[in-house]
Amino acid sequence: MSIQTTLNTGASAHFNKTFYDKKLLETAKTRLVHASFGQKRSIPEHQGKRVEFRRYELFTPDADKLTLEEGVTPDGQNLEQTHVEAEVRQYGAYIEVTDLLSKTAFDNVINDGAELLGEQLGTVIEWVTRDAMCAGTNVQYAGGKTNRLSLTSADKLTVADIRRAVRTLKKAKARMFTSSEDGRARKPHFICICSPDATYDLQSDALWQDVSKYAGAEQLYSGEIGRLFGVVFVESTEAKVFSQSVYTTVASHSANDDTVTLASMSDTAAAYLVPGAKLRIGTAEHTVKSADAANRTVTLSAAVSAAIPAGTAVYSEDAGALDDNKKGLDVHGTLVFGADAYGVIDVAEGGALRTIIKPCGSAGAADPLEQRSTVGAKVEAYTAAILNDLWIVRIEHAVTL
């Protein structure tokens, strides 16, 4: 991803382009793990916001059909393509600095602002990529379980889980990575992105090979921590964790009413409570018709004849096993994948992340007394999409607390 700094022509010498450019880059790159390994594509400007990936399918090997007869030209084969579309989006944020503050510590404010904004936008890019990667259906569950809700605290990530994921990728003929970030050749490998908690559980295994044991022999990825069975592990603090979206209680409900008032409704709960979502109230499952976050109400698809007592548990079943209080276990998602399993898509120069600094006076009539300056960061265009679902395995598991 290219990093640029846009500087207003009226800016003073305090705005050092190279310095702030470097500051934004350093902080953003600390967050870019998932976004580092995708197949990168750019889109030309003025060609719309939707981008189409074309993935060629492998030819089917058939010894009989491929046997040549002397002097006979065989029929040609047709290329088969799978099309994947994705839409780019822009992201951005800024902070405002008063002229009074600028007279005492303006450079420090710009420096700190660029650092904080770089980390914020870098994290957003990481989340967008991570969530796209975790939308796949090629899932395996630790401990031999068959679904997320059945995972318990005992179902931690093990070496056997990694071996199974590698087998899945090999059987799917997933391509292996053969070079490092700077293009230098290294041994063919798959990549695993995992949380520090998942790393903690794996490192206790005697088969774990710490990065210090081979660091001198190969060029490493940023954040690389070790390897197992041809898998290189890269750690991310933003690795996916599936937490229970709704966990609250009933505040009030009347008999024969389809609307329930909840004791609380978080932003996460509001995002989950869309039409058609499944919700447990006590032991009964209900379907959501609508939700009103401001009033903490949920309208169900059907009225409930008996009044639901206040204090009754209200919860979703989108995390791990429930405890006696209906609280779901946090489930971690560890990704093991091959090259070209997913793509990151941005505009002509790669969805540049850039700082935009506007000094006092640049706003004209909108700032008649020249009291305000701003420093912002903007992702010009970015998105991510899975290109081959069979080449990316999501292992869902518990972790040691």
Where are these regions (language model features)?
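Short helix/loop capping segments that flank catalytic or ligand/cofactor-binding pockets
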Residues: 61-64, 105, 201-204, 211, ...
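N-terminal "assembly arms/tails" that initiate or stabilize quaternary assembly
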Residues: 1-86, 389-394, 398
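Autoprocessing Asn-cyclization modules and mimics
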Residues: 153-160, 208, 236, 240-312, ...
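Extended, solvent-exposed, turn-rich assembly/linker loops in the middle of proteins
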Residues: 139-225
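Long, compositionally biased low-complexity segments
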Residues: 222-245, 319-339, 343, 354-357, ...
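Extended, compositionally biased alpha-helical segments that mediate assembly or anchoring
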Residues: 2-8, 325, 340-341, 347-401
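Long, contiguous amphipathic alpha-helices that act as assembly "spine/axial" helices in icosahedral shell
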Residues: 53, 80-148, 183-198, 367-379
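Cys-His-centered catalytic/binding microenvironment captured across papain-like cysteine peptidases
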Residues: 283-285, 299-341, 347-350
